[in-house]
């Protein structure tokens, strides 16, 4: 795909990375100071266990890394505008091993980023929980948080609530609309560049390799 897109200048692809158009995470991106970040936690809690037992259980190649964790990986890469240096992946299928879905249903990724930033990402597909993208961004003097209790900023030992419309589903259409407008009108800038998608896939492949080989990549 990479070489085909480089050869055919009139070919374009996009991806369903809708967290980029979520107004809360766009706010987080504006609020961070990259040099001050030292740790990020992102948890994709799927909350729709029943979906595992449809086509996902029948597809040998299906991976919770590419089907769930990828969204948090992209979110952190997009917010920081950084690509990880290394990744170690741990996984199990304890909740689902006696079901139709025998693949790993929980993955945990530990990533090293430039600027001495560490990140922990999990994708939990079998939890008895609502669907949510939890995020914590730890900086020297503040923490940005989104969880089941809402969205907050901790600063100077005080807690400030962030008024947000998370999960902000109405904004998801902006991504595909941007792609269509780009193809039709040619006067729009793509929200997701080709190179960003290839960088994201390379991280996911490295995470998958680490999981299978049980070592850092």
PLM regions: where:
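Rossmann-fold NAD(P)-binding glycine/threonine-rich loop
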Residues: 1-12
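Predominantly a Rossmann-like dinucleotide-binding segment in NAD(P)-dependent oxidoreductases
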Residues: 11-12, 18-100, 214
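C-terminal helix-rich "cap/oligomerization" subdomain common to oxidoreductases
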Residues: 12, 114, 180-217
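Structured beta->alpha junctions
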Residues: 17-20, 44, 125-127, 196
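A short, polar/proline- and glycine-enriched secondary-structure boundary/capping micro-motif
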Residues: 33, 129-135, 155-164
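A short glycine-threonine-serine/GTX helix/turn-capping micro-motif
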Residues: 60-66, 162-170
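Contiguous beta-strand/loop segments that form the cofactor/metal-binding neighborhood of enzyme cores
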Residues: 67, 73-151, 176-189, 206
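Active-site loop of classical SDR/Rossmann-like NAD(P)-dependent oxidoreductases
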Residues: 146, 164-177
């Amino acid at each position: 795909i990479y070489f085909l897109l480089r050869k055919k200048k009139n070919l374009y692809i996009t991806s369903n990375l809708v967290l980029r158009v979520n107004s809360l995470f766009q706010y987080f991106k504006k609020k961070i100071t990259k040099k001050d970040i030292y740790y990020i936690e992102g948890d994709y809690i799927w909350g729709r266990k029943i979906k595992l037992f449809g086509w996902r259980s029948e597809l040998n190649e299906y991976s919770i890394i590419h089907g769930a964790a990828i969204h948090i990986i992209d979110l952190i890469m997009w917010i920081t505008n950084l690509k990880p240096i290394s990744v170690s992946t741990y996984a199990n299928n304890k909740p689902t091993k006696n079901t139709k879905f025998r693949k790993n249903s929980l993955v945990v990724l530990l990533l090293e980023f430039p600027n001495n930033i560490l990140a922990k990402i999990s994708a939990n597909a079998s939890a008895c929980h609502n669907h949510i993208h939890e995020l914590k961004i730890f900086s020297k003097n503040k923490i940005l948080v989104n969880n089941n209790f809402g969205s907050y900023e901790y600063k100077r030992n005080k807690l400030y609530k962030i008024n947000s419309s998370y999960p902000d589903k109405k904004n998801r259409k902006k991504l595909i609309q941007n792609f269509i407008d780009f193809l039709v009108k040619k006067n729009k800038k793509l929200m997701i560049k080709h190179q960003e998608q290839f960088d994201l896939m390379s991280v996911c492949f490295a995470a998958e390799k680490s999981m299978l080989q049980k070592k850092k990549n």
